[in-house]
Amino acid sequence: MISTYDNVMFGDSRPLTDLLDQLSNERKHDEIRSYSGLKLDDECKLVDGGATFTKRGFASLCRLTSMPPAMVDWLCRKDYQPQLAGFINAEIAGLQFDDGQANRPGKRIFTRFREDAKGNQLCRALFSDRYAAVDANVLVAMVADALTASEREQARVHRLSYDGDELLCNLVWPGCDRQVGGEAYQVGIAIQTSEIGTLRMQVQPWIGRLVCANGLIVCTRTGEAVSKRHVGKIDLNQLAADIRVTVGSALAQADRALVQFLAGRKVKLADSDRIIIQLGRDHRLTTEQTKRWLRGHETTLSEPTVGEVSAFSIINGLTRSAQESEMASERTQLESLAGRLVSGRFDALYPEIEAEWRRVETRASMLSDEVL
């Protein structure tokens, strides 16, 4: 039985209205440049305008050249900026010459800038003109518009990670708190986007568990969610409509996933280490991510309300391990995987969920001791 109440807080949070104000007041602009507009001075700044590159912006510039990333990294670490600038300028000039020789139209490069706290211009990304810009302020405003006026005023942003380019956070509002089996949860939405092409734009239902401050992103194939790449033409009216549908159904979807998640307590499993290692291999996790998952599961088993190995404990171990990551994007990746492990379908019932875990258990039993 899920009961609703409105007095649970999950860690640090801030009003949604504050975040909207911050995003709307940022100084950012875009330019369409040719190859000649990318020439560098000896400090690896843009000659035209004097902008400094962010690390990811400089990486996108270097991708236009044939220089191996290891070479670029070595020159940067050894403080060979003038030489590096010379190499890049020569490569860019070569590209411009090749276009002229082939009678191709001049390359149009979508160049993104923002100011830092001191007012200095930063070049943060370079794209082809196929890039579809939907920035964080636009996306968050669409989410806010999908709420009622009172929900918007009282909505709170949790676990915000924002560096001016990538934004990841969870959003809850009145009516999002849940009490299930004596444990406190919250349901809401997870928001993710990048203004420099490093992350998909996503708005998805989300579940948070108070006792361990873990999060889980609902990722069923049959559920409502927004997930788009910043490529081609994006119809902003259609995007806003899709977000309204997702936000409108988010609590119902999260409630359903919460029931499925808790049903996993009844799916008793034998060898948790083998199962976690098998799932790590299935989903191409790194060795370190799998080790953190094993540690997170051990911590989960020590909780007074858990104790036994089950589908619930294994999934919760994964969401616990996600909190160890220093990168919000990795945390989101692992929380999304946890959501997929809860159930592959929005309307899946207990027998289907148990059958899938039995298949995983069977595959895990065949792992060789060398792999373990």
Spans of features found by a protein language model:
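Feature for intrinsically disordered/low-complexity regulatory segments and propeptides
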Residues: 1-141
